[in-house]
Each structure stands twice: as C-alpha cells, then as structure tokens.
C-alpha cells in the first residue's frame, strides 16, 4: 500500500503500519489497482482527479472518493471517470476518527452498480457497513 498525505504524522502512521510513503498523490496512484481519496472539499477532489489521478489510473483501476462533497462535483467526476473507462464511486463516511481507528466506518456509496461491486471488497475492509445509495 502506497499512501500520500500532507501530514507528516499521518504518513509516519502509514509507514509504522507497513505501508510505503509516496512523495506525491500521483506517485501513490501510479500503477495502483485501487485509488482511495479523502479530501476536504469538492474543489480539492476535482483538482486531484482532473489534475493528475485520472491520468495516473490504470485502465482497470477502481477509484473511490471518500470525501464529503457536493452532489454535482461527485456526479461530474463519476461521468469523467466513465468517459475514460474507469470505475469510480463516491463513498463518504460516517463514524468519525474512533470508527476509522476501529475499522467500523459506515460508507454511503453512490455510483454505477458495476463500479460499486468493484469497490465493495475494499470498503468492507475499511468499515462495517457499506450501503449502495444509488447511481
């Protein structure tokens, strides 16, 4: 698992847990089968995917955005991913940091059925409830 975060503390926890620290988001995403993002706002998510991550994604990659963002941005990014032949879901979380630490997050997932089925096994490892809320 390759990871990138602006927080040195977060990256230290990744490395301590057996992951590898990447120098940038695109370095973490290049060659990955799964790309998971969790960013502060829709503008950050849009900039990350349109700026680098769509290009870095493998044709078979599953893109999972766990940010809590506006519906219009999530739909536009899903359409942009589909136009590139990529599977993408919008999967905001509920449960806070305690649930994240315990692996008991709840994911409310939006996206096409096929993309959801590709993302489901990954999300099930990260949380206790994975709910497909539609496409």
Functional labels for PLM-detected ranges:
Residues 1-17:
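NAD(P)-binding Rossmann-fold cofactor-contacting core
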Residues 4, 38, 91:
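The conserved SAM/SAH-binding core of class I Rossmann-like methyltransferase domains
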Residues 6-7, 41, 112:
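Residues in the short beta-alpha loop(s) of Rossmann-like NAD(P)-binding domains
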Residues 8-10, 28, 95:
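Conserved beta-strand edge residues that scaffold enzyme active sites
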Residues 10-13, 45, 98-101:
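A short acidic, helix-capping loop that chelates divalent metal ions and anchors anionic groups
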Residues 19-24:
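Conserved SAM-binding strand-loop segment of SAM-dependent methyltransferases
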Residues 25-87:
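Rossmann-fold NAD(P) dinucleotide-binding segment
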Residues 48, 68-135:
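Rossmann-fold dinucleotide-binding core
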